[in-house]
Amino acid sequence: MNYQFHHVGIPTTEVRPGERYSAPFKMYTSGGEAPTRIQYHRFEEGCPLHPLLQTKPHVAFKVDSIDEAIRGKNVILEPYFPFEGFKVAAIEENGWPIEFIETSLSEEEIWGGSAYKNSVIYPESE
């Protein structure tokens, strides 16, 4: 299995510039544009994501196969496609969340925002 660093996600309670809102997840996301790929996530009450994802930082890795990456692990976010061509899942390991991403999209497509339009995670984006 090949693990390639993708980003770090940090929960925050602070409103940050450039936030995108995800109504299905009751979550705001900002950051990620810099080469360090640090994202910030702010959650509303009633967010359906696992409490570990809402309270602890996570590291995300691109993998060749999400199914292989999560096999036998404590899955806290079942595999799904937040937007076309981008499959995500998360596990808990030693009390910390780890996200896995399986995609053929380029980094520009992912971070540029065009892939998000009218997606599961951002259904109302333009």
Residues covered by each model-derived region:
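Vicinal oxygen chelate
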Residues: 1-33, 38-51, 74-126
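Beta-hairpin (beta-strand-turn-beta-strand) motif
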Residues: 62-66, 103-105
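Short hydrophobic/aromatic beta-strand micro-patches
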Residues: 9-11, 60-64
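Short amphipathic alpha-helices within nucleic acid-binding modules
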Residues: 66-73
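Short active-site oxyanion
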Residues: 56-58
